[in-house]
């Protein structure tokens, strides 16, 4: 797929573009009821709301800006409520950090209704089901991001329900980390049923029982970093049993430019039938003989978290979007791909996030520039 240290662009298999809009680079995209919501990577760009009811002619209907020193690159929506993260850069300790809540009943005029303030850097990636927000904030007394569940029954007054952390993070409680710096920290939780599946960067992942949400209990943890160097980014449970077993797809994030020379990050298939003993049984990787740099990465990142069957769509940075069939979880099979042209004014592709709408359309956000609307023939 990629040879001589270069990656192809403008190629596809079983996935085609039906629309595109020039936008500043984004960290996340979600779609609901004909509107796409994009969290941008860098200030002053904060969040864009785009009318995508005509996918061939998407139109921006609102754009929120953000102060220098912050970014709000993650967004989630349910009904008339929109949540965006406020995460600050190290040099701007005086700026507020946390989770901002908006009323979006008027899509062209988002109205702030609450701000859940956190300590330190703020909130990274998170999920939201309309009632609860599952967030990854930095909190006072803890080393690095932890997992927190907020009750959003009244979105104007979010209330903490519970928190969970890896042993060693609660420094105010006398715990001592066994790792260096902030290597072990929550990336984001995903809920399925009464379980949270929590990616934990260089701490691997955790499965947490929230059947009693006021008292979360660890079911199991697993960490393969080291020996594998790239951090765990997303832990996504499959919708149904496959081959009469339960499965979770885990992506590590390609950050090779920050590490010694390594194989590019890839995807793991984990058997969670016995959830106290999660067992990796297979991997999926896109071959590449080049190197990641500060400007260009090639490796796994983020799957579409909307799961409808056995095929998942996964962003691969410079490798674009990959469609992977897990009908046989022991032998994951690529069944399609889409690698865009570089965005306006850009030299490389960095496919960062993807949303899979229930009507089948895919929304692919580039880290540098542009939102693509796609159709899959898979």
For each feature predicted by the language model, list its residue ranges.
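Feature marking well-ordered beta-strand scaffolds used for ligand recognition
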Residues: 1-378
